[in-house]
Amino acid sequence: DKYQFEIYSTGKVQRELAREMSMTTLELNQLMRSDHKYDHMIDDATARISRENPDKNIIFDSRLAWNFVESSFKVFVSVSTDVAAERVMNDNRGEEERYQSYEEARRMLVERAATESVRYKEIYKVNYMDFSNYDLVIDSTYCTPDIIAEIILDEAKEYEKNGKQAQSKMLVSPYRLLKEDDISKDDRQSLENIAKEYEKVSRITDKIIKVKKNDETFTVVEGIEYAKAAYIADVPYVSIKVID
């Protein structure tokens, strides 16, 4: 509402469908593996709405909208599994998606992601966790929704300005790259000047940090000084490039 976008959420559609069928969302996901009509029903609706409303500002909240919505700015909003579990525990999603404990929520999220990944590969031959499918990948683990929304809007405007061409960008909090113990007193002294410059940065630092990624763990392989300075300065985001 604040940004005057309509929101179409396939997750909400799926939860409503699960409730109507007296199932949990995980049970519906498992059913959808053997009966693809539900996937096609939801995904066809996504494609139809985008075709019928080319001039509307619509946010498609969907794991596969990037594959069905033409001429769109494609964003993947990531989050650590631990924080995702905390969020769903605190989110009222109805009886069909209610958890008894944090551990149960985390386990169910992992199972759901695995089930959906297999299903999407079976039906559409796509991997929604392949970040090259997106114009922007932004991690939400440590940042506020307002800052994330502002960054997405700014990047989308650049996309429009550049003739709907985008160079894929991946943004994470420096807290995803480092822990407090990774930064020594010597680091704080030697990086003082860079950190002071970064204190003036409201959103994203200008250096691209090269990392390796193993599941949810990032390891910095180039640009560690910039990652540490961003951590010290409490900058919301750094740009990263994942390398093999």
Please report, for each region that a protein language model flagged, where it lies by residue.
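Small-molecule kinase domains that catalyze NTP-dependent phosphoryl transfer to phosphate-bearing small molecules
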Residues: 97-148
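Short loop/helix-cap segments at secondary-structure boundaries that form the rim of catalytic
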Residues: 66-72, 129-132, 230
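Short, amphipathic alpha-helical "lid/cap" segments that border enzyme active or binding sites
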Residues: 42-43, 145-153, 195
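ATP-dependent small-molecule kinase phosphotransfer cores
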Residues: 6-69, 82-85, 94-97, 107, ...
